[in-house]
Design a protein with these regions (language model features):
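Charged interaction scaffolds used for protein-protein
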Residues: 1-10, 18-43, 51-96
Length: 96
């Protein structure tokens, strides 16, 4: 999932070091601690979008609640799938 549409606006979304740093600062937790906690997952998604927008010079300007209100369950599920698929993708790339 490389972008997300919130309130009709396509925004970049990717995991970056900045996203992990934002998440740690906002929650006091590491990304590995997300587990099945929906609030932590939404917060990490927010951090990924905020960080990608910052890196790409795209205006973001939403707080966490506004962002969450504009998300769908499908957005969250798609992002959760990319989180669980990421280690397998890395493994297959290094094995090839």
């Amino acid at each position: 999932m490389k972008e997300i549409t919130i309130y009709g606006k396509k925004l970049p979304m990717r995991m970056t070091m900045g996203a992990m740093l934002r998440f740690k600062r906002m929650t006091g937790k590491d990304v590995e601690e997300i587990g099945h906690d929906v609030a932590l997952l939404v917060t990490f998604m927010y951090c990924c979008v905020a960080s990608a927008c910052n890196a790409d010079n795209v205006e973001f300007g939403m707080d966490l609640d506004k962002f969450a209100d504009g998300m769908s369950v499908e957005d969250m599920n798609g992002f959760a799938e990319t989180l669980t698929a990421a280690p397998d993708e890395k493994k297959s790339r290094t094995e090839a």
